[in-house]
Amino acid sequence: MSNFTAKVPLSERMADVLISKDRWKDDEEGYLKVKYGLEIILINVMKFALVYGIALVTGLLLQTVTVHLSYLWLRRYSFGLHATKTLNCTLISLMMFVLAPFVFQNVPSNNWIVLGTFAFILLNMFLFAPADTESLPLIGEEHRKTLKRKAMIGTLILTGIALLIPFAEMKTLIMIGSLFQVISINPLTYKLLRRRYRNYEKYE
């Protein structure tokens, strides 16, 4: 294997195998777009398989699903930071969705803690959601207002679920997933990671 081949990411090599470049020989731009999209899908599939494979082997599947779904529920409208490198994204995902559930799986919470925590989360959604990135600026003030409103409604719905669920440990895991999303939209996180905040201002 050549040094060049060894340095090519696995996802890119798989995309090359799955897409016939000959079919796109008259449309190089189209080929690159399709290849990039396929690479993103392959990266996410491999990351998903790794995270949930480890969760399954370690007996943390339910805990991982709880934290992950809580995180995704709020992220749908509040957006937030993404890791800039695939390896970093994978490592962060393992820490968030495998290590954190392992650490907090037996930590119970009561409804007073739930109310206090989600009051803090709701405040952050009001102040900072939605948060964009350099690669995905959220353009349009009305669009951002709509996303903020939906993010806050989503937070209230998740609060209700956490209050009503009868398992004290599950309440904790829901809060952990939600707090991870709060971290990803907080401007302090952007500052610490030296990432640009309010990227839409560059286009408006």
From Swiss-Prot:
Disulfides per UniProt: none
Membrane-traversing stretches: 52-74, 87-107, 111-131, 156-176
Membrane topology, as annotated: Multi-pass membrane protein
Chief place of localization: membrane
General function of this protein: May be involved in the proteolytic processing of a quorum sensing system signal molecule precursor.
Family: Belongs to the AgrB family.
Protein name, entry field: Putative AgrB-like protein
